[in-house]
Every structure is written in structure tokens, then in C-alpha cells.
């Protein structure tokens, strides 16, 4: 078997893998270091006749995803650290309603608004949940770009 090897950034790999997995809608809001996912999908989704919306805020993006997946459409958003913290109430509603929300958290370090370089500080928030209620969500934590593709 002759497989082509491609060198690509993790953000681009996740975006293309989402397309390959049949994602029909992407709702996002730009925040470093995940902005490349939205940039990539802004062109590709249009070419494929799929929906791309740059939301007015992170809260708008996660709520649009919840609306889309509640109708049976494969949809996703991506964000980073402090913006994911803003989404916690919506994520607890998604868990309560058992909605298949896909949220890519390209983490960055630091408390508050943090810094713009990658880190793993949000892992506990993702695993243990930051919203109200006693719930667990499925967390896939890739450690390589290949795993980003395989797990998307």
C-alpha cells in the first residue's frame, strides 16, 4: 500500500478531517491559536456547499452548533481556553440534552485571558466540566497531528 505522507499544521489537519468526516456546518469565532481552523473552513465549506458562519461571539457559535446538531446535522465549532470558559453554561445544557456537540479546544496557557502560545491547562476543565451539574463529556486529547486527524 502506497500512502502519501503530508506535512501539515494541526489546525489544518483537524479542519480537513472534519470535512472528511462529513461536517456540514461550522460556527466559529476567531481567537488565537485556533483561528486557522475557521480560516481554512471558510473557503472549503463554501466550495462544498456546506455552511460556514463567523458568529458574533463564542456564545453565539456554541449555541448555533447546539441548534444544528439538535436537527441531526453534523456541526462543530472551535475555540481556545478563555473562550471555552465562556461556553460552559451552553456545554452543560448540551450534556443535559445529550447533544453530539463537537468543540475543538486549541488550548493556550495562563489564567484569565492567558497567553497565545499552546499549553494543556484546559484539560481538567474539559474532563471534569466547568458548567453547573454533575456531568461528564467525551474528551479526546490528541498528542500528535496524526492523532488530530484520527480522532476528528
Name each model-derived stretch.
Residues 1-129:
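Thiamine diphosphate
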Residues 118-152:
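Conserved thiamine diphosphate
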Amino acid at each position: 500500500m502506497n500512502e502519501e505522507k503530508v506535512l501539515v499544521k494541526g489546525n489544518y489537519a483537524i479542519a480537513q478531517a472534519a470535512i472528511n468526516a462529513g461536517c456540514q456546518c461550522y460556527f466559529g469565532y476567531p481567537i488565537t491559536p485556533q483561528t486557522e481552523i475557521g480560516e481554512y473552513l471558510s473557503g472549503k465549506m463554501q466550495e462544498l456547499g456546506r455552511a460556514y458562519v463567523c458568529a458574533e461571539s463564542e456564545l453565539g457559535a456554541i449555541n448555533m452548533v447546539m441548534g444544528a446538531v439538535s436537527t441531526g446535522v453534523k456541526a462543530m465549532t472551535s475555540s481556545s481556553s478563555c473562550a471555552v470558559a465562556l461556553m460552559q453554561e451552553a456545554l452543560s445544557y448540551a450534556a443535559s440534552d445529550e447533544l453530539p456537540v463537537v468543540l475543538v479546544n486549541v488550548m493556550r496557557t495562563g489564567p484569565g485571558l492567558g497567553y497565545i502560545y499552546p499549553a494543556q491547562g484546559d484539560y481538567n476543565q474539559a474532563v471534569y466540566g466547568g458548567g453547573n451539574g454533575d456531568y461528564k463529556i467525551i474528551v479526546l486529547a490528541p498528542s500528535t497531528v496524526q492523532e488530530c486527524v484520527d480522532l476528528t
